[in-house]
């Protein structure tokens, strides 16, 4: 039997989207493993999904992630520069969605 895993997608998603993203990707027949991780900029908890799949299912997996991982507006408080008092100013930032890396798989074994 030929190896069905030819592509590894590494998708970084927000914790809030983890369950929906996992179900969505599993629904197309892909194998999913997740690792807890944290973002560097905001330090928020997120998850890195390791998704193994045949190369021809890459588009389906990306569509599944796009449907289940949504972007959100959150506010980060930063001190006002030049202010005599350190008053925080809320700054809107866009977070969420998914950051996806695609890697070819030369060899895959289940032991």
Residue locations for each model-derived region?
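Positively charged, small/polar-rich N-terminal and surface patches that mediate targeting and assembly
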Residues: 1-111
């Amino acid at each position: 039997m030929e190896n069905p895993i030819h592509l590894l997608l590494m998708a970084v998603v927000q914790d809030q989207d983890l369950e929906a993203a996992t179900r969505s990707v599993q629904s197309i027949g892909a194998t999913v493993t997740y690792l807890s991780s944290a973002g560097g900029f905001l330090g928020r908890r997120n998850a890195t999904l390791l998704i193994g799949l045949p190369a021809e299912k890459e588009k389906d997996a990306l569509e599944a992630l796009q449907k289940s991982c949504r972007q959100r507006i959150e506010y980060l408080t930063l001190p006002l520069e030049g202010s005599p008092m350190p008053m925080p100013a809320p700054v809107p930032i866009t977070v969420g969605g998914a950051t996806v890396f695609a890697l070819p798989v030369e060899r895959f074994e289940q032991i």
